[in-house]
């Protein structure tokens, strides 16, 4: 207890980035507390001043800042059981399979985190509303590297857990 969920995720991401090398972490948030804690952790922070536009607005802010990168990994801050090892393994899977995208997979269902190579940035920029990149993954299944997840708990998204009332 004690450490906010978003900080746990950020620390796992920082650990993964230091293991992988050549990574920049960009936090996109509407929340002042998250912005200041992330800045204290030494990562780049961008404010989403239009969160009402949905997930796509945060994604686009991050993409615009990372447009020179070869690829972007998108992660949500409310998957407390996701491990550093899974993040690192996903990047390795993406690199070794030479596909344009990579994502986690559990029981044939894709999940976060996801990685998109630069060739998909334009398609990602065109998404609107409360949608992420899943539609692009579904549009190009032949160009996706899937990392099979052993422990279902890793992909539990706390928002969904509490919004649905499911376990």
Feature roles, as predicted:
Residues 112-116, 156-158:
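Short glycine- and hydrophobic/aromatic-rich loop-to-beta-strand nucleating segment
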Residues 60-62, 119-124:
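Short beta-strand and adjoining strand-loop segment in the mid-core
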């Amino acid at each position: 207890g004690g450490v906010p969920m978003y900080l746990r995720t950020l620390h796992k991401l920082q650990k993964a980035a230091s293991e992988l090398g050549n990574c920049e972490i960009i936090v996109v948030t509407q929340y002042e507390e998250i912005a200041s804690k992330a800045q204290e952790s030494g990562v780049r922070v961008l404010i989403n001043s239009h969160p009402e536009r949905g997930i796509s607005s945060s994604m686009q802010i991050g993409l615009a800042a990372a447009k020179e990168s070869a690829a972007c990994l998108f992660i949500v801050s409310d998957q407390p059981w996701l491990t550093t090892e899974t993040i690192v393994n996903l990047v390795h899977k993406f690199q070794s399979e030479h596909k344009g995208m990579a994502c986690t997979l559990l029981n044939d269902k894709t999940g976060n985190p996801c990685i998109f190579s630069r060739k998909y940035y334009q398609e990602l920029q065109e998404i609107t509303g409360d949608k992420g990149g899943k539609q692009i993954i579904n549009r190009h299944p032949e160009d996706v590297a899937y990392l099979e997840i052993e422990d279902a708990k890793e992909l539990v998204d706390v928002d969904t857990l509490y919004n649905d009332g499911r376990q």
